[in-house]
Every structure is written in structure tokens, then in C-alpha cells.
Amino acid sequence: MPENKITYNPKIAGRFRGYLPIVIDVETGGLNPATDALLEIAAVTVNCDAQGVFYPAETIAHHIEPFTGAVLNPDSLAINKIDPSHPFRFALQEQDALEQIFKFLQAAQKQANCNRCVLVGHNAWFDLAFLNAAINRSKIKRNPFHGFTCFDTATLGALMYGQTVLAEALKRAQIPFDNNEHHSAIYDAEQTAKLFCKMVNTAGWP
């Protein structure tokens, strides 16, 4: 079971009303969270230093086995280049993957003195919808995330940089982006975390 390797600054709780931002990216077998497979999930925690400067901290990720009866849309698989049957995916069942990730995040949340985690994502509604659907299928009771509040870097990117596309917002923020790595849950989550922290640091503390 992965464990936190850093100490989280409890100062974070004062910046986001008791929420710990967690950047999430999912890769899926389609666009419908009720019927389509969740295939990858990555979570990136954020932390801040003694001066209150935010930075991406730790990453936890899993490949996930499609749930029984899940739809695998060929168009979606062509985009994310995932082969759900590949033997080296080492995929976990949804419940096992989420429970491991949530335990990791809950430890960070406790250290940061936060009440809940809040999902950060690029077009965050999509990631939150798939996450909530997987939680419901798995009947997980201890969900660290707020059920509907989220921070959307597409919206924030439009506000800060006039761009809603992740690659373009990163370019405006002078953060590298490799199109060959795009649609990997880990890569997209880590780049989104860099973008989120850059925007938070630019905005400053209230």
C-alpha cells in the first residue's frame, strides 16, 4: 500500500476553506460514466511551502479493470491508446484501486488539517462524474471528495490565459506539454497540477 513520503503543510486549509485540492485525471472507454469503463485514474496531491507557494507533491495512479458489462468505445480507445486486455497493465478492480487511492489521499488530507478533498481537473465535471459512478458501483463509504464541488482548470485557464484547451493553457503558462504523452492519466494529471499551482500562485492568497 503506497504511503505519503512528505509532510503536508496545514496552512493549506486556510487557502481553500478547509479543502485539500487533489488533481484527478481519468482515462475511460467512452463518455458516459454510467455505462462506460473507467480504465485509468491518477491523483496528484498539492502542497505549499513555508512561504505559501503551492507545488505538485505526490502522484498515485492505477490501471483499472473494466467493470462487468462496461462499454468500451473503439473511438475512445483510439484516442487514449489503451488496450484493456494487455497483460502488462496490471490493472486492479475499481474498488481495490479506489480504496488504495483514497487511503493515500485521506492521510494527506489529515496532515494538511483539511476537512475534505476537492477534485481539481481539466473539464473537472467529466472526471468527477466518472469518479462518482465508480464509487457508487463499488459501494465505497469513505469517500474523501466533496460530492459536487470541484475546481476546473479549463475555466480557470480561460480566466487567467484566455485558453480552455489544456495544451494551450500550459503553453501560455510556459509549462511544457508533450502531445505524445497526452491521454496518459499520470501525465495529464501531473501537467494539470503544474497549471493549477501556477494559477494559484499567480492569484496569491486572499
Task: Walk through the language-model features, giving the residues of each.
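Conserved non-catalytic scaffold segment of RNase H-like nuclease domains
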Residues: 2-122, 183
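Conserved protein kinase catalytic core
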Residues: 31-33, 158, 194
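Catalytic phosphate/metal-binding cores of nucleic-acid and nucleotide-processing enzymes, i.e., regions
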Residues: 2, 16, 140-141, 160-162
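Short, glycine/acidic-enriched loop or turn micro-motifs at the edges of active sites
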Residues: 28-30, 155, 191
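Substrate-recognition/cap helix-loop segment adjacent to the acidic, metal-dependent catalytic center
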Residues: 109, 126-148
